A protein has these predicted regions:
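Conserved acetyl-CoA binding element of GNAT-fold acetyltransferases
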Residues: 40-51
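Short amphipathic alpha-helix that is part of the acyltransferase structural core
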Residues: 1-22
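Conserved active-site alpha-helix within GNAT-family acetyltransferase domains
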Residues: 82-103
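Glycine-rich phosphate/pyrophosphate-binding loop shared by adenosine-nucleotide-utilizing enzymes
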Residues: 27-32, 42
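C-terminal "cap" of GNAT-fold acetyltransferases
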Residues: 100-112
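Conserved GNAT acetyl-CoA-binding A-motif
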Residues: 70-83
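Conserved acetyl-CoA-binding loop-helix of GNAT-fold acetyltransferases
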Residues: 49, 55-68
């Protein structure tokens, strides 16, 4: 999980240096792709966890770390592309520190 934590920290700390569009990171556990829009919003375009690391709470840890570390200038975290039925159902029931993801026409949004 530490690799995903490092990826998230790197993205958030260097947010202003990235061009708008896709920002992709890979690590030994899988990959995390962000989409940087023109307005202040953290968009997770995709979360891919390698099969051997699934069902170990990695996705939960990623979402919790995003909620805990996203600077206050951002009003929400959005998980945009949900192709997996497992992730879709997980986001519907996810709750952390009284924060939940709500399905919108743009993806799953969590107000910070």
């Amino acid at each position: 999980m530490s690799n995903f934590t490092e990826i998230i920290n790197t993205y958030l700390e260097s947010y202003s240096t990235y061009n708008n569009g896709m920002v992709e990171f890979e690590c030994k556990y899988g990959s995390l792709t962000f989409y940087k829009p023109t307005h202040p919003l953290i968009i997770v375009h995709s979360i891919y966890i390698l099969p051997e690391y699934r069902q170990r709470g990695v996705c939960r840890n990623i979402l919790q770390h995003l909620i805990d570390s996203t600077p206050k200038m951002f009003k929400r975290v959005r998980v945009q592309t949900v192709l997996s039925k497992i992730l879709y159902e997980y986001l519907l029931r996810f709750e952390y520190k009284n924060k939940k993801f709500r399905l919108s026409m743009y993806g799953f949004d969590c107000l910070l």
